[in-house]
Amino acid sequence: MELSSPSREEYPMPRGRVGIMAASLMGLLLLHTVSWVSGARPCSPKSFGYSSVVCVCNGTYCDSLDPLTLPDPGTFSRFESTRSGRRMELSLGTIQANRTGTGLLLTLQPDQKFQKVKGFGGAMTDAAALNILALSPAARNLLLKSYFSEEGIEYNIIRVPMASCDFSIRTYTYDDSPDDFQLLNFSLPEEDVKLKIPLIHQALELANRSVSLFASPWTSPTWLKTNGAVNGKGTLKGQAGDLYHKTWARYFVKFLDAYAEHKLRFWAVTAENEPTAGLLTGYPFQCLGFTPEHQRDFIARDLGPILANSTHRDVRLLMLDDQRLLLPRWAQVVLADPEAAKYVHGIAVHWYLDFLAPAKATLGETHRLFPNTMLFASEACVGSKFWEQSVRLGSWDRGMRYSHSIITNLLYHVVGWTDWNLALNPEGGPNWVRNFVDSPIIVDIAKDTFYKQPMFYHLGHFSKFIPEGSQRVGLVASKKSDLDTVALLRPDGSAVAVVLNRSSKDVPLTIKDPAVGFMETVSPGYSIHTYLWRRQ
């Protein structure tokens, strides 16, 4: 069944919270709801029996947002998503000269400045590209608009696997000709030329913002490896500085050359996706093992100099690209060597073992030791652990896990956050080793339909409102609460605050900006809000 734009009766207009008159608790809450205007279209909700809903999209209908505009001076915008089904709904409030509420006070400290943000995005894997391209052109366009356009959540980062990974339907590298040390047979296969590259171009055309690409390899060609296989325990043959290592470093340059021929240039490359994976016996999918010492020497003697002496010398090099549990030691080993450190722009981290690795002891300590080396979250997904269901359509909890991670990362100096697959099928694939996981967008090819999950909107509460160049500033709470909060100043001088409530309790709060006054509001249980206001 094709969906048309829902009528007012089917989906009543959001009513905001003007009805809250508990003056003793909050004062008059001066928020009024903005009706859906111009291009914005409401969510077409569907429940699959989990904690919240997905928004259903097809070739004729998809929910959308208006291009972001700053509220008038003296007012603030509040964008709300809730477990009960609101999705980035806009209401406006008036900034007060005096505080009327008695709940939690969050005070902006604009002089307390921290890291500048690079951005937010996801990965164009083979699996993501296969799913997106299986949609009709109209539905495909709406999916990419949802992620990249002003009517969507305005991603500005795309991760590109260098050749195959587990989210491929076959194993391949860009040069599977044995002992081709000159890389004469290096070539991009159909996965790049017909799947990923056309979709990346379409995304860039739809985006109003500048979009940065970064690439990560999973495995080298097998003839460069000790075990002669794409997976399992194996490293590069020989040692740093030799023919094997130099050939592997030149493979990076060949990749960048090949994409440049397709008019795509990269912001960064990571030295290796999850280098510890290739140190594990029986590792099931593509990997290439490095210890921190091996990565240090490979960067210092091979990858660093070869990139620097190529036409891609401006491409940034990110080390680690693995669990933050490995910090700060991995950074200490690599960055203690000035020959390696001079080539390293940043440290990329994955989220899978975060429950074993407190942010303060890992990210915080690494920033303390290396304040000039940026931290960047390069991969996250839910559903990968053996006890987890791969896909849970409409899970609010999974959305909260994303936003909690993003806020925690921002509070510990991380400059960007990258989701894993941009889109998967209802099984959580395809994946050649059946390592199925969840994704913010699930594509049902048979119905030419895709589902935008709570994870999509949780990410959007950051990506749409925190453009590249925004700077995190202090936001101090008057007392302990159940809220996760973060504040930033945007390049246009306006301020943005994100408030996540993972508890069931409504939390009355006031946001104070010393430059303009007080914003009285409430954070309902199981909700996320983004606040935006001018500071002058």
Swiss-Prot record:
Q: Topology versus the membrane, per the UniProt entry? A: Peripheral membrane protein
Q: Read off the InterPro entries from this record.
A: GH30_C, Glyco_hydro_30, Glyco_hydro_30_TIM-barrel, Glycoside_hydrolase_SF
Report residues carrying sugar chains: 58, 98, 185, 208, 309, 501
Pathway of this protein?
Answer: Steroid metabolism; cholesterol metabolism; Sphingolipid metabolism
One GO term of the cellular component aspect?
A: endoplasmic reticulum
**Which compartment or compartments is the protein found in?**
Lysosome membrane
Q: Which residues form the signal peptide?
A: 1-39
User: Which pairs of positions does the record mark as disulfide bonds?
Assistant: 43-55, 57-62
Gene Ontology biological process terms in this record: autophagy; cholesterol metabolic process; glucosylceramide catabolic process; lipid glycosylation; lysosome organization; regulation of TOR signaling
Q: Tell me the keywords, alphabetical order.
A: Cholesterol metabolism, Disulfide bond, Glycoprotein, Glycosidase, Glycosyltransferase, Hydrolase, Lipid metabolism, Lysosome, Membrane, Signal, Sphingolipid metabolism, Steroid metabolism, Sterol metabolism, Transferase
Q: What does this protein do?
A: Glucosylceramidase that catalyzes, within the lysosomal compartment, the hydrolysis of glucosylceramides/GlcCers (such as beta-D-glucosyl-(1<->1')-N-acylsphing-4-enine) into free ceramides (such as N-acylsphing-4-enine) and glucose. Plays a central role in the degradation of complex lipids and the turnover of cellular membranes. Through the production of ceramides, participates in the PKC-activated salvage pathway of ceramide formation. Catalyzes the glucosylation of cholesterol, through a transglucosylation reaction where glucose is transferred from GlcCer to cholesterol.
PANTHER family associated with the record: GLUCOSYLCERAMIDASE, LYSOSOMAL ACID GLUCOSYLCERAMIDASE
How is this protein named in the record?
A: Lysosomal acid glucosylceramidase
